[in-house]
Curated annotation (Swiss-Prot):
It comes from the Bacteria. The keyword Cell inner membrane does not apply. This is Beta sliding clamp. It comes from Pseudomonas putida (strain ATCC 47054 / DSM 6125 / CFBP 8728 / NCIMB 11950 / KT2440). Coiled coil: none annotated. Belongs to the beta sliding clamp family. GO terms for biological process: DNA strand elongation involved in DNA replication. Confers DNA tethering and processivity to DNA polymerases and other proteins. Acts as a clamp, forming a ring around DNA (a reaction catalyzed by the clamp-loading complex) which diffuses in an ATP-independent manner freely and bidirectionally along dsDNA. Initially characterized for its ability to contact the catalytic subunit of DNA polymerase III (Pol III), a complex, multichain enzyme responsible for most of the replicative synthesis in bacteria; Pol III exhibits 3'-5' exonuclease proofreading activity. PANTHER family: BETA SLIDING CLAMP, DNA POLYMERASE III SUBUNIT BETA. GO terms for cellular component: cytoplasm; DNA polymerase III complex.
């Protein structure tokens, strides 16, 4: 194997592919990236046995075919440290990878390509083409609510639900829930649900960088595959039953608060400074036309904000984890937001004013 390539052409796919590779591995070959040269195409593959990412680069010069695996992070760090306009010469010589650029030379250890595992792919049962920017927005609006290392392993991921002409994403950690829907060219009559693991969702979002580009999604029995121009991403699915999110969405809340998103966000952020560092509780006191936000901590320090809101119902006092409210306001984009409440023991429903494609549920806190 022998090829030459510009630093820039190699670095972008290498960084994305190396992002999948875990630092601590049980199998040494999983710390490596698989390099394959065929014709005038170089492909780079990284995997952790759950998620696999393949990047493809066209080579400008004729190349000698071959395949080998090399330490992903070391190769990436070498590329990063070379000058921007460097031309990199890479070849395999006696089980070592020789990397040359200008007056720099590196010799890396290798492992045989045969040792490199591939993610098993069954047949796909459903295929659709989506705009990258729309799918990225769907993920960005919901991924913050995914659980991390929850024993309920099905919460450490995102539910993707396809039905006729609609793709919906839902995530929850048991304390809050995020839901977003987008229209999509899907010819599926009945609802089909899959759970994509947390790491898979975050890596997929990193791929969706082309505002004009499309991404092809294939859903199989045990895997999801996404293909863009230069990359193919495959992830195993989580085998589990996601909670019935429609039962979680509060119904019949009679107290509607409409407020300025940025003003609320700033007031919550300031109040949060003096909330309990562990529990992050703040108290909301609603009265006609105004919202009072209070926080205090074990050191007897207190913060209070008053903010004008559009509200005409009876007075109400309710507690929340301020981080959860800030996360929601952080992904919204409209000027005005709606907060729908019923009583101090019921969850709040947050939505953008004038936009129904996203809904957020936050459970209250006892203060």
């Amino acid at each position: 194997m022998h090829f030459t390539i510009q630093r820039e052409a190699l670095l972008k796919p290498l960084q994305l592919v190396a992002g999948v590779v875990e630092r601590r591995q049980t199998l040494p070959v999983l710390s490596n990236v698989l390099l394959v040269v065929q014709g005038q195409q170089l492909s780079l593959t990284g995997t952790d046995l759950e998620v696999e990412l393949v990047g493809r680069v066209q080579l400008e010069e004729p190349a000698e075919p071959g395949e080998i695996t090399v330490p992903a992070r070391k190769l990436m760090d070498i590329c990063k440290s070379l000058p921007n306009d460097a031309l990199i010469d890479i070849k395999v010589d006696e089980q070592k990878l020789l990397v040359k650029a200008g007056r720099s030379r590196f010799t890396l250890s290798t492992l045989p390509a045969n040792d490199f595992p591939t993610v098993e792919e069954g047949p796909g049962s459903l295929t659709c083409n989506l705009e990258q920017s729309k799918l990225r927005r769907l993920i960005e609006r919901t991924s913050f609510a995914m659980a991390q290392q929850d024993v309920r392993y099905y919460l450490n991921g995102m539910l993707l639900e396809v039905s006729r002409n609609t793709l919906r994403a839902v995530s929850t950690d048991g304390h809050r829930l995020a839901l977003c829907s987008m229209s999509a060219p899907i010819e599926q009559e009945d609802r089909h649900q899959v759970i994509v693991p947390r790491k898979g969702i975050l890596e997929l979002a990193r791929l969706l960088t082309d505002p004009e580009g499309m991404v092809s999604i294939v859903l199989g029995q045990h895997h999801i595959r996404a293909t863009t121009g230069e990359f193919t991403f495959t992830s195993k699915l989580v085998d589990g039953k996601f909670p019935d999110y429609e039962r979680v969405l509060p119904k019949g809340g009679d107290k509607l608060v409409v407020g300025d998103r940025q003003a609320l966000r700033e007031a919550f952020s300031r109040t949060a400074i003096l909330s309990n560092e562990k529990y992050r509780g703040i108290r909301l006191q609603l009265a006609a036309g105004q919202l009072k936000i209070q926080a205090n901590n074990p050191e007897q320090e207190e913060a209070e904000e008053e903010i004008s809101v559009d509200y005409e119902g009876s007075s109400l006092e309710i507690g929340f984890n301020v981080s959860y409210l800030l996360d929601v306001l952080g992904v919204m984009t409209t000027e005005q937001v709606r907060l729908i409440l019923s009583d101090s023991n019921s969850s709040a429903l947050l939505q953008e004013a004038g936009n129904d494609d996203s809904s957020y549920v936050v459970m209250p806190m006892r203060l």
